[in-house]
């Protein structure tokens, strides 16, 4: 369909029987209306031509050859009969054969049939609107239950067999013959409703606005009751409240879209255009046909049998009619969803029939296989790798991809800045990779966001906007914090990059889709930009430190200090004394690391500000060291206290590693930057 802005779009939903007829019906010059498929046949076995009123009828779906009717006549441009749209003899319209890709037909069902998607889907829309258990509705649809009409003053479900066997067993000998009389048909049509027709009657009687009002009142009453303390009753109340919310949402959707609930029960079954369910003839008289054709044949045969029985309802037993209605319902269910009744339907070769649901859904379905995932203009694709130097809102684009995406913008700026005189020379400069090209490319990229997408796009965080930067190589660089939103990792995953062209698209990308604007999960509200995988491993390695504790023994079994390093050269272990150094600031520690005096996991003592909480601790020191001048050191598990002769604390050192120091500095800088940004906004 095409909306008011001339955008092509696809919409899936319920339609009225009148709309289905409007899609298919055509009026011939003689006044005959064609569009209904009444025969299960496809092609004549002798002439290989489509059968009239069959699944491939040319009168209904259009000619097989463009502007050539079933008789073989053609309408050439400039001919005398150019104004005649239809052949006078066979009734085929003189149009292009491509009409068989979108011209639909329909099957007029002899009895109403429920749409299996709306009956057995989770949640069941029909069960939600009627506020009935799904099992009872299924029993009603498939003839296991019957529904007493309001005229009988018993609008409840009842099992006829149980009713007659238990309550009226004494009158069984006189009631049984009544079922075979013509009067029972009149009684059944007046007093009893069964099958999908009963569902349709109940849906047609619904007032959606009353459902909204009653459900809202009931939900408020349950909310006011609160918790009773009984776990079972509270659970039932919660389930009921969730059901009422779903029911209100469904009723509101039907009202907003102007859809009638009874449209969930089919009276007319649309028939797909023949080009979407083809029959292919191969060499050796082999015929390959779509499974949908076989399923349509089954529906038409069973529907014709039911129509025949209904015409002779005086002679046909009621049980036989109900059984045939059930067969029609099952045939339509198999056409729409072959696995809806449990085990999928199979053909004579034990092969599972591929229904309409199977054709549409899944990775090999019509949408994901044919319509989605195609290449589009101004897009590229490459493997993603980690970009540790990138900001959260940045991504690294390879030079090759960037110059292709922004080529038109670069050409425009080259001509605007009079670096070239025409497009041909500008393309040559780009091909030769002149320095001015890269300068202009960086200038263009600075103000133009790009979109990164990783398939499958299961939620809105599957496509986000980034500020591109040029990187060497042929891979896209990505900040590791945004991987969770894409469900991506760096083991060979690929991502597509798209270029928003219009100003509206660029504004939407900047305001709504930038990665630093999507820090929380839209589903549950939890943070989604959290360290994962590579970042967790890096943080673990950075902060693990040396596992040697401060309480290690002075000497090991070999008579060596535990603080000594072991060098294994020529299988002769040698030990060198490794003293834990004291540093007055983190800058001194980083300088020692750059001079390769310490390692990332080397334990060290870092001077810390005097903290009264530490001083006031009543922890017993592990060791106290006294020096000749009267100063002393109290060594604790995680810190060291230096005091003078007067027992005054001069300084405190904490035991840490360079990895902890680096991690702390990064967090401190991030917090300070956030505080400054927040103060600016205020």
UniProtKB/Swiss-Prot annotation:
Binds 1 Mg(2+) ion per subunit. Binds 1 Zn(2+) ion per subunit. Gene3D superfamilies: 1.10.40.90, 2.40.40.20, RNA polymerase II, clamp domain, RNA polymerase Rpb1, domain 3. Its EC number is 2.7.7.6. It catalyses: RNA(n) + a ribonucleoside 5'-triphosphate = RNA(n+1) + diphosphate. It holds the Pfam family RNA_pol_Rpb1_1. InterPro entries: DNA-dir_RpoC_beta_prime, RNA_pol_asu, RNA_pol_N, RNA_pol_Rpb1_1, RNA_pol_Rpb1_3_sf, RNA_pol_Rpb1_clamp_domain, RNApol_RpoC1. Zn(2+) binds at residues 69, 71, 87, 90. Keywords: Chloroplast, DNA-directed RNA polymerase, Magnesium, Metal-binding, Nucleotidyltransferase, Plastid, Transcription, Transferase, Zinc. One of its GO terms (biological process) is DNA-templated transcription. Mg(2+) binds at residues 489, 491, 493. One of its GO terms (molecular function) is DNA binding. Signal peptide: none annotated. It is found in: Plastid, Chloroplast. Its cofactor is Mg(2+); Zn(2+). GO terms for cellular component: chloroplast; DNA-directed RNA polymerase complex; mitochondrion; plastid. Belongs to the RNA polymerase beta' chain family. RpoC1 subfamily. PANTHER family: DNA-DIRECTED RNA POLYMERASE, DNA-DIRECTED RNA POLYMERASE SUBUNIT BETA. In plastids the minimal PEP RNA polymerase catalytic core is composed of four subunits: alpha, beta, beta', and beta''. When a (nuclear-encoded) sigma factor is associated with the core the holoenzyme is formed, which can initiate transcription. This is DNA-directed RNA polymerase subunit beta'. It comes from Oryza sativa subsp. indica. The lineage of its organism: Eukaryota, Viridiplantae, Streptophyta, Embryophyta, Tracheophyta. The gene is rpoC1.
């Amino acid at each position: 369909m095409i909306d008011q802005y001339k955008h092509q779009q696809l919409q899936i939903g319920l339609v009225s029987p009148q709309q289905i007829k409007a899609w298919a019906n055509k009026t011939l010059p003689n006044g005959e209306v064609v569009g209904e498929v009444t025969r299960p046949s496809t092609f004549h076995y002798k002439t290989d031509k489509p059968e009239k009123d069959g699944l491939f009828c040319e009168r209904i779906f259009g000619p097989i050859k463009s502007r050539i009717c079933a008789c073989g006549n053609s309408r050439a441009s400039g001919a005398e009969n150019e104004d005649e749209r239809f052949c006078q003899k066979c009734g085929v319209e003189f149009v292009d054969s491509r009409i068989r890709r979108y011209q639909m037909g329909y099957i007029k069902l002899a009895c109403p049939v429920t749409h299996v998607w709306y009956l057995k889907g989770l949640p069941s829309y029909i069960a939600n609107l009627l506020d009935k258990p799904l099992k009872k509705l299924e029993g009603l649809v498939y003839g296991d239950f019957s529904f007493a009409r309001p005229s009988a003053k018993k609008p409840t479900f009842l099992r006829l067999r149980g009713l007659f066997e238990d309550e009226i067993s004494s009158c069984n000998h006189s009631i049984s013959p009544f079922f075979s009389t013509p009067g029972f048909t009149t009684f059944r049509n007046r007093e009893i409703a069964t099958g999908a027709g009963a569902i349709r009657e109940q849906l047609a009687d619904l007032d959606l606005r009353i459902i909204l009002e009653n459900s809202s009142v009931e939900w408020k009453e349950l909310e006011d009751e609160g918790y009773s303390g009984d776990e079972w009753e509270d659970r039932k109340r919660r389930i009921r409240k969730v059901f009422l919310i779903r029911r209100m949402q469904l009723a509101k959707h039907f009202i907003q879209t102007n859809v009638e609930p009874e449209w969930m029960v089919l009276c007319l079954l649309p028939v797909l255009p023949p080009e979407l369910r083809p029959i292919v003839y191969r060499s050796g008289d082999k015929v390959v046909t779509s499974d949908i054709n076989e399923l349509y044949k089954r529906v038409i045969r069973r529907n014709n049998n039911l129509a025949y029985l209904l015409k002779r309802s005086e002679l046909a037993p009621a049980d036989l009619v109900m059984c045939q209605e059930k067969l029609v319902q099952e045939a339509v269910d198999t056409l729409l969803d072959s696995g809806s009744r449990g085990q999928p339907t199979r053909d004579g070769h034990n092969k599972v029939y591929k229904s309409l649901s199977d054709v549409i859904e899944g990775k090999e379905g019509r949408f994901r296989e044919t319509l989605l995932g195609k290449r589009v203009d101004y897009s590229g694709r490459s493997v993603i790798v980690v970009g540790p130097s990138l900001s959260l809102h940045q991504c690294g684009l390879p030079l090759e991809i960037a110059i292709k995406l922004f080529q038109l913008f670069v050409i425009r700026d080259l001509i605007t800045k009079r670096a070239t005189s025409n497009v041909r020379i500008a393309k040559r400069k780009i091909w030769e990779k002149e320095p001015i090209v890269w300068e202009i490319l960086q200038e263009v990229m600075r103000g133009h966001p790009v979109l990164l997408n990783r398939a499958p796009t299961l939620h809105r965080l599957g496509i986000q906007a980034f500020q591109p930067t040029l990187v060497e190589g042929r891979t896209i660089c990505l900040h590791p914090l945004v991987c969770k939103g894409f469900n991506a990792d760096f083991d060979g995953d690929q991502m597509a990059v798209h270029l928003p062209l219009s100003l509206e698209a660029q504004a939407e990308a900047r305001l709504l889709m930038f990665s630093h604007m999507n820090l929380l999960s839209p589903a549950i509200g939890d943070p989604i930009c959290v360290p994962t995988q590579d970042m967790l491993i890096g943080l673990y390695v950075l902060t693990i430190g040396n596992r040697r504790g401060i309480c290690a023994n002075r000497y090991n079994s070999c008579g060596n200090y535990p603080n000594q390093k072991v060098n294994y050269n020529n299988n002769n272990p040698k030990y060198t004394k490794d003293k834990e150094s004291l540093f007055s600031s983190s800058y001194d520690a980083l300088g020692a690391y750059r001079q390769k005096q310490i390692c990332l996991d080397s334990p060290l003592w870092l001077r810390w500000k005097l903290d009264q909480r530490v001083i006031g601790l009543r922890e017993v020191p592990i060791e106290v060291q006294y020096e000749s001048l009267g100063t002393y050191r109290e060594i604790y598990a995680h810190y060291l206290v230096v005091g003078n002769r007067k027992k005054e604390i001069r300084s405190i050192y904490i035991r840490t590693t360079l990895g902890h120091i680096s991690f702390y500095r990064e967090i401190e800088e991030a917090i300070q930057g956030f505080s400054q940004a927040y103060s600016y906004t205020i």
